[in-house]
Amino acid sequence: MTFALIVGAVVLTALTAYLGWNREIYGRQPVYRSWWMWLGPLIAAVPVALRVLHINWGGPALSVVLLVLASGLMVGYVEELLFRGIAVKMLRAGGRREFSVAVLSSLLFALSHSVNVLQGQELRTVGTTVLYTFAFGALMYLTMRSFRFIIAAMILHGLTDPTAILATGGIDNVSDAAPAGIPAVVAGFTLFFLVPLGIILLLCVRGKAGEDKTGAHVADASVAS
């Protein structure tokens, strides 16, 4: 867990509290949900479950496992707070409909990972990561909207990176050697299912905060069916 990550978490948490945004960010989503939105967290959870089965739990020391998990959960908290919390709140406050909110917040999330090129990563790796994170961002938006609370997206996001690290030894890496076994299944699922389905589901997003499915303004759109 890096010092910068901890500082980022503290700063963002303090900022939202100072601005009085905690209720809007951490509270119940002010927009209705549809049954198909549950596909978002379901799709995102498949790679996590597969990696858990592949992890050699008897390999790394318990302290290493706990540190990786803690770091991953912190990443999930910070990134979701920034992109599904602050960004979504600001986009909704600007009067944008949920399709624009989902697309723009996912795009910002994806572009934030393009800075990896400054660390010397190959363009192919960065490009693949940006495409993946755009689709993943869409799935996290749907996770937040289907569960109705951002904490669900924070937890699912927080488990994604550490399970990848513990199962493969790293993230955002492209190896010349073809993966085998469960890692190959995860890679194939991500390439052929997670990314395209994430984008397809994103295109189906409708609604606007404060409105029910008919477009009528309601006091609490989150309780509308």
Task: Describe each PLM feature range.
Residues 44, 76, 98-114:
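Small-polar-interrupted transmembrane alpha-helices in polytopic inner-membrane proteins
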Residues 51-62, 118-124:
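Membrane-interface helix caps and helix-loop-helix hairpins in membrane proteins
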Residues 1-41, 145, 197-218:
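Membrane-helix interface linkers and caps
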Residues 78-104, 145-149:
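Membrane-interface helix/loop boundary segments of multi-pass membrane proteins
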Residues 26, 158-225:
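C-terminal membrane module of polytopic membrane proteins
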Residues 47-52, 108-118, 164-179:
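Hydrophobic alpha-helical transmembrane segments in multi-pass integral membrane proteins
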Residues 34-35, 61-62, 95-100, 125-126, ...:
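Membrane-helix interface segments
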Residues 126-182:
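Functionally important transmembrane alpha-helices
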